[in-house]
A protein has these predicted regions:
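Conserved polar catalytic motif of the HATPase_c/GHKL fold
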Residues: 58, 62
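Receiver (REC) domain switch/output surface
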Residues: 1-7
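Bergerat-fold GHKL/Histidine-kinase-like ATPase
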Residues: 17-18, 27-28, 49-52, 108, ...
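Helix-loop-beta hinge of the Bergerat
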Residues: 16-45, 117, 121, 125
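Conserved beta-strand-loop-beta-strand hairpin that lines the nucleotide-binding pocket
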Residues: 9-15, 64-185
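Conserved short strand/loop->alpha-helix "switch" segment adjacent to the catalytic nucleotide/phosphoryl-transfer site
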Residues: 35-57, 76-77, 132, 137-139
Length: 185
């Protein structure tokens, strides 16, 4: 397996920088490495790791497909084939082929911070449709960002809409006597 991601580590204590090409196969190994690093830092809560993995998968996929490759989710109707076929064609041609995704990961004791930036034109994050409204239930657009907002503690978009910052605070441990005392009180 050829991983099309460049890594420069460490930037600082608990900080990593990745630069990914427009290859969806580069995403899972990066997420796996980040989750492994978190586990070594005591973030062994499986639910938290699952939530973080989901948010990272969605954010990196959005940066790849909607950001760098500029493929609209409106192309997903009954079939996703046209969406992925266009993405595959664009991966190989200018200006899309030279665009990169940058990921900064800061793993701290009590929180994690991820900043993901693509080189696409961005989008108007203030006009995202609510995927839970009845008229949007069967549409694909907005679902990934909805998931990200619901699994992360803080989500911030930066103009022009090609950069997302996500934060999760470390969940309390069931082994923590102070946390257990709070449950009993």
């Amino acid at each position: 397996l050829i991983c099309t991601a460049k890594q420069q580590v460490p930037v600082g204590q608990g900080e990593m920088f990745f630069e990914l090409e427009n290859d969806p196969m580069a995403i899972p190994p990066i997420i796996e490495q980040l989750m492994s690093d978190l586990a070594h830092r005591g973030w062994d809560d499986e639910l938290a790791q699952m939530r973080l993995s989901l948010a990272l998968q969605e954010a990196l996929s959005n940066a790849l497909y909607h950001g760098n490759l500029e493929v609209s989710s409106s192309m997903m109707t009954e079939s996703t084939d046209p969406f992925y076929q266009l993405a595959e064609r664009r991966r190989l041609v200018q200006p899309y082929s030279n665009r990169m995704i940058q990921l900064v990961a800061k793993h701290e004791n009590e929180r994690v911070l991820y900043i993901i930036e693509d080189q696409g034109p961005g989008f108007d994050f203030t006009k995202l449709p609510d995927p839970t409204h009845e008229e949007n239930i069967e549409r694909f657009n907005g679902r990934g960002l909805f998931l990200i907002r619901n699994v992360m503690d803080e989500v911030t978009f930066h103009a022009p809409g090609n950069r997302i910052q996500m934060v999760m605070h470390k969940p309390p441990s069931l082994d923590d006597p102070d946390y257990l005392q709070g449950l009993v009180a």
